Amino acid sequence: YDPGNSAVAKSNARVIEAHLRHTPPVDLLVTSETNGDEFAKLLGLHHHSFDPDRTQVPVSSTQIREDLISNWHLLGPGSRELLAIRAVFIGAESTGTTTTTLAVQSELMKRQGNFATTNWIREYGRDLTMRKKEQAEAMGLSEYAVPWTTNDFVEIAIVQQQLEDVAARTGGPVVCCDTDVFATIIWERRYLGEKAALPMPGDSQNRIYFVTQPDGVPFVQDKIRDSEELRISMTREFEDD
């Protein structure tokens, strides 16, 4: 809102009104601004002035936009979820994705300030893999006797996204993700082939991908991984998509 430019003020009011048409009825505008009364009139709302001296909330929205990182702790959970950068580490098995993700989290936390609460998201698919393996062992079967299904990957995608969103709402400006929904889709293709059903997610401006490489990284078999030879082809899958 620019009180010195009536055309801009009216244009901003029209944008807000357009958004309000998709929400429950609103009749009150709460601001800490000296021009709150005037802007409320443009919107046809009542105005309530809250903390105009900024003693309870010592910052303005302009200041937050100018330095988002320093003011991160003042954002609400919903704003954090929308604005947090998702640093996503993906790659074939035994290429160091978890090690790298944890190392980046550690380095960010050393910066202190709002980075001290940097969250790390574990790979839920690994949890489910262990459960399926234990299920097979309990029945006296080979671990391959309990096949992967579409429902398994739907569960992984849903839970992985939930874990990520909770971490964004409660942590610092960057969320360190040891995989995400996109990687889940690549693994679904690997195990289900033409039966894979998960759709590719849309583009996200706050998501940065890092693909870990097998070069020089020894393959460590932890009893749930595929073969070492598969690492090369899976790495290409991640890079190509």
Residue ranges, per PLM feature:
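Conserved substrate/cofactor phosphate-moiety recognition/catalytic segment
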Residues: 106-162
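Nucleotidyltransferase catalytic core that binds NTPs
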Residues: 1-86
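Short loop/turn segments at strand-loop or loop-helix junctions that form parts
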Residues: 1, 123-125, 178-181, 211-216
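A glycine- and Lys/Arg-enriched "phosphate-lid" helix/loop adjacent to the NTP-binding pocket
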Residues: 64, 192-241
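Glycine-rich phosphate-binding loop used to anchor ATP phosphates in small-molecule kinases
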Residues: 152-204, 213, 220
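Glycine-rich phosphate-binding P-loop
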Residues: 87-106
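Surface-exposed cleft-lining segments at the edges of enzyme active sites
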Residues: 87-91, 134-152, 182-187, 221-226
